[in-house]
A protein has these predicted regions:
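Conserved glycine-rich Rossmann-like NAD(P)H-binding loop of the short-chain dehydrogenase/reductase
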Residues: 29-46
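Active-site helix of classical SDR
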Residues: 123, 157
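Alpha-helical segment proximal to the catalytic Tyr-Lys
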Residues: 128, 169-174
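The beta1-alpha1 cofactor-binding region of Rossmann-like NAD(H)/NADP(H)-dependent oxidoreductases
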Residues: 40-41, 61-73, 105
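Substrate-binding pocket helix/loop in short-chain dehydrogenase/reductase
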Residues: 98-100, 104-109
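C-terminal helical subdomain
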Residues: 174, 181-182, 189, 198-238
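Conserved glycine-rich cofactor-binding loop
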Residues: 8, 15-16
């Protein structure tokens, strides 16, 4: 049997990069998918790719930083499938790579809202719909445990995700819901290219090659594992 046969997975930020790769990987393993991004135009091709693999999928555009939009997203997902087994909080923005003294306040708020508040809103709305044995996977980063120059709001937002991951793990453990964080490491994505414009993109792992830990955490193999932090590329090499 496929690892995720019959499981319902909601993936935010699924129109490109890692989110798209996870949607396709989960589809191959038998999951039913709810794919989300802000842009319906960019989301539609991913849904078509998932359908081509024979998986059931619904594409639901929504802004994770807007509570009304998030409530509609989650309620539509739950109405369609009856509950959620896997939640991947993947949506996020990089923001400007400038020093704090130069960081525009509106950009600061935009990044914090997308990366931290958005994860809070999606998680909060999803909790009542999480099935027993569900798995929540939160995306973190190397700069969520070590502040570095010119990473500003992105780094701060991911520090917040680290804390929220621990809080959710503790609060949901008695509901048989596990919550874990994953640092995907550097990948060949648009966000990575924006952060490191001079880097050779081909030197980085493709998102499609970086899904092993996400499959593990979504599957029943990880039951009982909660409050942990994984490095995807180290897990991939095991």
């Amino acid at each position: 049997m496929a690892q995720l046969e019959g499981k319902v997975a909601l993936i935010t930020g699924a129109s490109q990069g890692l989110g798209r790769a996870l949607a396709l990987a989960y589809a191959r393993e038998g999951a039913r998918l709810v794919v989300n991004a802000r842009s319906e135009e960019r989301l539609r091709p991913v849904a078509e790719e998932v359908e081509a693999l024979g998986a059931e999928v619904v594409a639901l555009p929504a802004d994770v930083a807007d509570s009304e939009s998030v409530d509609r997203l989650v309620s539509q997902a739950a109405d369609r499938f009856g509950g959620i087994d896997v939640l991947v909080n993947n949506a996020g923005l990089l923001g400007p790579r400038v020093k704090i003294e130069e960081f525009p306040e509106d950009e600061w708020r935009r990044v914090i809202d997308a990366n931290l508040t958005g994860l809070f809103l999606v998680s909060k709305a999803s909790i009542p719909h999480l099935n027993a044995g569900a798995s929540v996977i939160n995306l973190v980063s190397g700069v969520s445990v070590e502040g570095r120059p010119e990473w500003g709001a992105y780094s701060v937002s991911k520090f917040g995700v680290e804390g929220l991951n621990q809080i959710l793990a503790a609060e949901l453990e008695d509901r048989d819901v596990r919550v874990n964080a994953v640092d995907p490491g550097g990948m060949n994505t648009e966000m990575r290219a924006a952060a490191y414009s001079r880097e050779d993109a081909e030197s980085r792992v493709a998102p499609e090659e970086n899904v092993d830990v996400f499959l593990y955490l979504a599957s029943d193999d990880s039951r009982g594992v909660t409050g942990e932090r994984f490095k995807a590329q180290e897990f991939r090499r095991r």
